[in-house]
Amino acid sequence: MESPMHLPEVIAVEQESQQMGLSVTAPELHGSLSGLLAGGGCNGPDWLAMILADAEVAAPPKGSVLERLYQATASQLEDPDFAFQLLLADDGATLAARADALFEWCRAFLGGFGLAAHSRSVLSAEGDEILRDLAKLAQASVDDFDMNEDKEDGSLEEIEEYVRVAVLLLHGDCLIGPCAPQRLN
């Protein structure tokens, strides 16, 4: 049996999304969900309808891939060992596809975060800076970069790690508060 904190595979998320008639990619869905949860929003079965802005969308069935995606994401965000991971492109994807998935994930994260945190007016200085950084990534495209596989692969991994930690910091800001001391080590 899979660990409750293990994210489903990208292909499984996309297949189930298509079966449900959803026009959303796995990175977009996970980014929106992560933003919603990081901002302290929707702790229940209506999460999918909320992030898709469609009240007609049914909640994912119990035990489904999308329900497991929700459970794993929520568990990872709460994990004291900072287990949160981004659901991006498959491992075999090209650098350009991976970068595009990351930019798409960031766009979706900001949308989900905005849904949850719209009433919160105060973030820490770090939280404000993180949102600005994520907005820059959300506006980026692979056309903005020289996609040299050898040189850029490590850089993309560093950006992915920055985004991962940034989400945890924003989650702490929203659920613990901007004035509480936060330590990641």
Swiss-Prot record:
Gene3D superfamilies referenced in this protein's UniProt entry, alphabetically: YgfB uncharacterised protein family UPF0149, PF03695
Record-level GO cellular component terms: cytosol
Top-level taxon of the source organism: Bacteria
Signal peptide extent: none
Chain ranges passing through the membrane: none
Pfam families reported for this sequence: UPF0149
InterPro entries linked: YgfB-like (IPR011978), YgfB-like_sf (IPR036255)
Homology family: Belongs to the UPF0149 family.
Cross-referenced PANTHER family: UPF0149 PROTEIN YGFB
Protein name: UPF0149 protein Xfasm12_0965
Source organism (scientific name): Xylella fastidiosa (strain M12)
Native organism taxonomy: Bacteria, Pseudomonadati, Pseudomonadota, Gammaproteobacteria, Lysobacterales
